[in-house]
Swiss-Prot record:
Cofactor annotation comment: Binds 1 [2Fe-2S] cluster.
InterPro entries given in the database record: 2Fe-2S_ferredoxin-like_sf (IPR036010), 2Fe-2S_ferredoxin-type (IPR001041), 2Fe2S_fd_BS (IPR006058), Beta-grasp_dom_sf (IPR012675), Fd_pln (IPR010241)
GO molecular function: 2 iron, 2 sulfur cluster binding; electron transfer activity; metal ion binding
Gene Ontology annotations for the cellular component aspect, listed alphabetically: chloroplast stroma
Required co-factors: [2Fe-2S] cluster
Highest taxon, organism lineage: Eukaryota
Function according to Swiss-Prot or TrEMBL: Ferredoxins are iron-sulfur proteins that transfer electrons in a wide variety of metabolic reactions.
Keywords of this entry: 2Fe-2S, Chloroplast, Electron transport, Iron, Iron-sulfur, Metal-binding, Plastid, Transport
Name of the featured protein: Ferredoxin
Subcellular location: Plastid, Chloroplast
Domain 2Fe-2S ferredoxin-type intervals: 3-93
Provenance organism: Medicago sativa
Chief place of localization: plastid
Keyword Kinase in record: no
Source taxonomy: Eukaryota, Viridiplantae, Streptophyta, Embryophyta, Tracheophyta
Amino acid sequence: ASYKVKLVTPEGTQEFECPDDVYILDHAEEEGIVLPYSCRAGSCSSCAGKVAAGEVNQSDGSFLDDDQIEEGWVLTCVAYAKSDVTIETHKEEELTA
């Protein structure tokens, strides 16, 4: 399946279709969208965002704790879309504040 991913970035909103078996960060890059990242393994906070609507699966990540995930935090490098989803990107400073 594919879902519509909407990224709300400081430069504006980007939308694309993302297969449910491709990480959101990887597919955004294929679409030419530049997002922050570092480890690409779900073990840091460089790519952190906040889910504003919809659902993701980020069980491959290790950096976020359950409370942060419940609050809507997401690591785009290890997140699969599970529905149409809206994510506010570039949130590392807010997450680690």
